[in-house]
Regions:
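Basic, alpha-helical interaction scaffolds
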Residues: 2-70
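RNase H-like, metal-dependent ribonuclease domains
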Residues: 18, 40-58, 63, 73-394
Length: 394
């Protein structure tokens, strides 16, 4: 067999020293032809517009730059700088800018983050995906790499740094009961078209009381979730007639949607454990009730599965359970009390309930962190200040 210092495997060029120089040259050669195509499609008074060229860049060039970046991201900065030049050429064509134009300004104008940050984003997201996928073949390899690697940086070490900053991430959904055994729920959205924030307190009170009068003898449980600007999250439920109030501070940075689901989950567990036969869950979260009704949640399938199981258990104990939607901040006493409790939980010094991140929420946290890093770079950059005065936010 012929000895080679470079080999191509699954579209990635590996060299004997893993410098990735051969792969970046390969990427540059592929992208240069596509940049020439973009040039032929652009012009000052004719040709494709900015949005069309940006779409072409994302499809034909950025996709090539992204492929395999979790592997070649360990290359030296000098090697990866070749790829930055490719992005710069493409953005100049898209904006019709001259060579002297600030690259940072072009990136902001086109909404394309620096490649360094994009690679970091894709790397962290792939690390999260590995961690949350059961029996992923790469997981054990990465664990071994962290222990034996002598390099200052590696894919395993960099992703682990990020994973250490966030709570545990939920794995795949495993149903406890067959879906055909789940109790079907039809929430009541009657108030959706009857009252809103512009309705007078008197109208709101009369409309809500008229609806609740249909369910005389039911225990009404109000639930709510809250999140502040710092990412602190709380959830609560209350039963005014029984004088019961429960509030919890949840894991930071999870969504309000998740907080609302946790509040309902805790209320359902209270109903189950205290064997309440007739109960109404009152919430202002339309999205959570729609998820319960449809049986599908894009961001929280695990938690929704838990809710369905608890609802089924309550039904099997001959419990009569009703879900009612009410508008937020319309003077409904129980709803306002739950909202106050949820906001009060934000001041708790310790987290009462650790909530594992779902994949989409963890991805959103990556995007938030990378977006903040890009904003800092743009704010502190000494170039492109003319655009910065008009567009200080990236």
């Amino acid at each position: 067999m012929e000895w080679k210092t470079e080999v191509k495997f699954l579209g990635v060029m590996f060299d004997s020293r893993l410098t990735w120089a051969a792969h970046t040259d390969y990427i540059k050669e592929r992208c240069q032809k596509r940049i020439n195509l973009m040039r032929s499609l652009s012009g000052t008074s004719w040709g494709a517009n900015k949005q069309t060229l940006l779409t072409i860049y994302k499809a034909l060039i950025r996709s090539v730059l992204d492929y395999g970046c979790t592997a070649y991201n360990t290359a030296s900065e000098n090697v990866k700088a070749k790829l930055d030049k490719i992005q710069a050429q493409a953005l100049r064509i898209i904006c019709g800018a001259m060579k002297c134009t600030s690259i940072a300004a072009l990136q902001v104008e086109c909404g394309e983050m620096p490649l360094k940050l994009r690679r970091e984003s894709l790397q962290n997201k792939y690390g999260i995906k590995i961690k949350t996928t059961a029996d992923h073949p790469t997981a054990n390899i990465l664990k071994q790499n962290i222990k034996i690697s002598k390099k200052k940086t590696s894919f395993a070490k960099e992703t682990q740094k990020f994973l250490n900053k966030i709570p545990p991430t939920a794995g795949p959904v495993v149903g406890k009961t067959p879906p055909w055994h789940h109790k079907t729920i039809q929430p009541i959205f009657e108030l959706h078209n009857q009252i809103n924030k512009n309705s007078s307190p008197t109208v709101v009170r009369q409309t809500v009381l008229a609806l609740f009068a249909k369910y005389n003898g039911f225990v009404k449980i109000y639930t709510d979730g809250s999140k502040n600007a710092e990412g602190v999250v709380g959830a609560a439920f209350c039963i005014a007639t029984l004088g019961i109030q429960r509030s919890f501070r949840l894991s930071d940075s999870i969504s309000v949607y998740t907080a609302e689901m946790i509040a309902i989950q805790q209320a359902l567990l209270f109903i189950l454990h205290h064997k309440i036969k007739q109960a109404i869950i009152v919430t202002d979260s339309l999205s959570v009730l729609q998820s319960i009704q449809s049986g599908f949640s894009h961001t929280r399938p695990n938690l929704l599965e838990e809710l369905k199981c608890i609802i089924t258990e309550i039904s099997e104990q001959d419990g009569n359970l009703i879900f009612i939607w009410v508008p937020a901040h319309c003077g409904i006493i129980g709803n306002e009390a739950a909202d106050k409790l949820a906001k009060g939980a934000l001041s708790n010094k310790q987290i009462d309930k650790i909530v594992p991140f779902e994949l989409k929420e963890a991805y959103a946290l990556v995007d938030e962190g990378i977006g903040a890093a890009w904003q800092r770079e743009w704010t502190n950059n000494k170039k492109g200040r003319a655009l910065f005065r008009m567009k200080s936010r990236k």
